[in-house]
């Protein structure tokens, strides 16, 4: 016979929630790198009974109505994906107790953060190009307060190579930005044999612009970038990119 023990204690455990903020994107789905990070966060959070309840972009937060609604959402933590404006961080630290940042640009020590060193990435990229025989290397990507750009300049110095502003293009990290950046370098008659792109999405636009000018990659000019997004392996030729562990 079945013997029943003491009445089972049934607990209703309320799952905890997290919001992801795509700080440098107008659309969450437009940033494949941080979309991959968000997916990894969701998988790890689930193991601890947390759920990604909301996803917003910096543009959403700039809307006062959405920002007001967000401040009223009962989430237990905020994860900021990518570089942000100061007012964005101020908004979250004022409204939420648990805020963590992840990206390539370190922020103040007073904040919790998971950072992959952008300076080391830049040095590794340029060192690889130098090993291939390149001594004239351009840069396409954001420049203001961007550790990959400062790392690019530092790497040139360490490798004994000159820095020329005309060999760089300050553009938004997007395929459109990369396309514009490549055309800027060609218009400036940049003296380069290789281009370091700040991320893969930018490199996609760069490659498109170079192909329009009948430049062969890597025969005429080499391109290297950062992130190792899934799309990179389907480009022709396949994009040379530095892997960043997302797990």
Language-model region placement:
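Flexible loop/turn connectors
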Residues: 183-247
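N-terminal helix-turn-helix DNA-binding module of bacterial transcription factors
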Residues: 1-14
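Hydrophobic/aromatic beta-strand patches that form the interior of the parallel beta-sheet core
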Residues: 79, 100, 112-114, 138, ...
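Short beta->alpha junction loops
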Residues: 53-61, 167-176
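Alpha-helical recognition/docking segments in bacterial nutrient-uptake
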Residues: 13-127, 131, 187, 191
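Hydrophobic alpha-helical segments within soluble ligand-binding/sensing domains
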Residues: 114-139, 150, 154, 175-184, ...
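Periplasmic-binding protein-like
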Residues: 19, 75-82, 138-141, 168, ...
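Short, solvent-exposed amphipathic alpha-helices that sit
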Residues: 32-47, 121-125, 144-162, 177, ...
């Amino acid at each position: 016979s079945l013997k029943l023990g003491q009445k089972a204690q049934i607990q209703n455990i309320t799952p905890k929630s997290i919001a992801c903020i795509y700080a440098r994107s107008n659309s969450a789905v437009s940033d494949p790198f941080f979309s991959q990070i968000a997916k990894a966060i969701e998988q790890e959070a689930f193991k601890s009974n947390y759920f990604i309840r909301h996803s917003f972009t910096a543009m959403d937060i700039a809307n006062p109505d959405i920002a007001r609604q967000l401040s009223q959402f009962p989430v237990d933590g905020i994860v900021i994906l990518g570089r942000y404006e100061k007012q964005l961080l101020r908004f979250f630290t004022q409204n939420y107790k648990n805020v963590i940042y992840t990206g390539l640009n370190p922020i103040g020590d007073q904040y919790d953060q998971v950072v992959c060193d952008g300076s080391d990435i830049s040095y590794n990229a340029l060192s690889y190009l130098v090993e291939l025989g390149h001594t004239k290397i351009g840069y396409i990507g954001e420049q203001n307060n961007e550790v990959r750009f400062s790392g690019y300049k530092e790497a040139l110095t360490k490798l004994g190579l000159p820095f020329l502003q005309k060999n760089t293009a300050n553009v938004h990290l997007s395929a459109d930005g990369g396309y514009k950046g490549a055309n800027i370098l060609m218009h400036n008659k940049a003296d380069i044999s290789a281009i370091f792109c700040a991320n893969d999405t930018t490199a996609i636009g760069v490659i498109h612009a170079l192909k329009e000018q009948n430049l062969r990659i890597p025969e005429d000019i080499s391109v290297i970038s950062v992130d190792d997004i899934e799309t990179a392996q389907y480009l022709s030729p396949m994009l040379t990119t530095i892997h960043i562990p997302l797990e």
